Amino acid sequence: MIIDRLFNEVEKKGNVCVGLDTHLDYIPVNLKEKYQDIDEILFEFNKEIIDKTYDLVPVYKLQIAYYEAYGIKGLLGYKKTIEYLRSIKKITIGDIKRGDISSTAQMYAKAHFEGEFEVDFVTLNPYLGFDSLTPYLKYIESGEKGVFVLLRTSNPGAKDIQYLKVSPKDEYLYYIVGDKLNEIGVKYRGSCGYSSIGAVVGGTHIEEAKEIRNRYKNMFFLIPGYGHQGATGKDVSLYLNKGNGGVINSSRGIITAYKNYKDGDQRFADYARKAVLDMREDIQSERGV
C-alpha cells in the first residue's frame, strides 16, 4: 500500500516534505534567462532541487495553484515535474484541495489519480460533506493512492470555521471531521498501522497537537507551517508518533533558501539541500532520533 511505502520512506529518510510551490519570483534570473518557455523554467528549477534532495526526503508536494496561475504552460511544468518524480520512484502529493459534489469529484479524482496529472496522494477539502470524498475511495482501495483531508489547518482564519462548537457533544468541528475520517479510514490501513486516508494538521497551532495525535493514532498527518509560517521542529514533533506518522512540509524555506547567500543564484539547489539537512536535524533533535 502507498501508506506503507510512505511510512517506510519516513523511517529511512526522516519527515521532511519538500514543497515545490514554485513562483517565477522564486527562480534565479540566470535560470529564467536560460529558457524561453515557462514550463521549461519551472521544470528545470524543480528538477535541480529534486536532484539535490531526493536522497534526503521521503516525499514531494506540489501546490497546483502555483502552476495554474501560469496557464497551460504552467500546468505543463507541473506535469513534467510529477512525471519526473514518479520516474525516479519518489512519492508525490498533489496539493489540489478539491471539494465538490460527487459527480464533479469523480472527475477530479480521475484527473489526479490517472493520466497526465497522476500523483500518489492528493489533498481534499471535506466541507461539502463526505460524499465529496467517495469518488476517491475506489483509487484508495487499490492500495496505490491516498488522500490527506483538511482537518486543522495552519492559517489564522482556520478558527473561523474549524473552531465552531457542534452538537451533540459540543466539540470543535474539526474533531467531528476527524472522527468521521477515522471511521472511514479503518478499512484502508496498511501493515504499518496507518490509514491511506490521512489529514492535514497545521504545525502553527500546537495547543491541540497532543490531543489530535492521541485521538487519531492510526491517522498519518501532512503537517504544513514549518519555517516561514512560524512552526519549529519542537512544534511539529508533537504530531509525530515515535518519529513517524507524519511528514512536515516546507516550501519557501527550502526552495528560496539560496536568497540568503551571495552566490545563491549559481548554487540555489545546493542551498536547498542545506535547508533540508538543517530542517531534518531540527526535527530529529526534537523527536529524539
From Swiss-Prot:
InterPro entries linked to this entry: Aldolase_TIM, OMPdecase_type-2, OMPdeCOase_dom, RibuloseP-bd_barrel
Single GO MF descriptor: orotidine-5'-phosphate decarboxylase activity
Pathway noted in the entry: Pyrimidine metabolism; UMP biosynthesis via de novo pathway; UMP from orotate: step 2/2
Enzyme Commission number: 4.1.1.23
Keyword flag Lyase: yes
HAMAP family xref list: OMPdecase_type2
Protein name stated in the entry: Orotidine 5'-phosphate decarboxylase
Sequence similarity: Belongs to the OMP decarboxylase family. Type 2 subfamily.
Record GO biological process: 'de novo' pyrimidine nucleobase biosynthetic process; 'de novo' UMP biosynthetic process
Reactions catalysed, as given in the entry: orotidine 5'-phosphate + H(+) = UMP + CO2
The protein's enzyme class: lyase
Gene3D superfamilies: Aldolase class I
Keyword Lyase recorded: yes
Catalytic residues identified in the record: 97
Pfam families (UniProt xref): OMPdecase (PF00215)
SMART domains to which the protein is assigned, alphabetical: OMPdecase (SM00934)
Bilayer-spanning residue ranges: none
CDD domains xrefs: OMP_decarboxylase_like
Keywords attached to this entry: Decarboxylase, Lyase, Pyrimidine biosynthesis
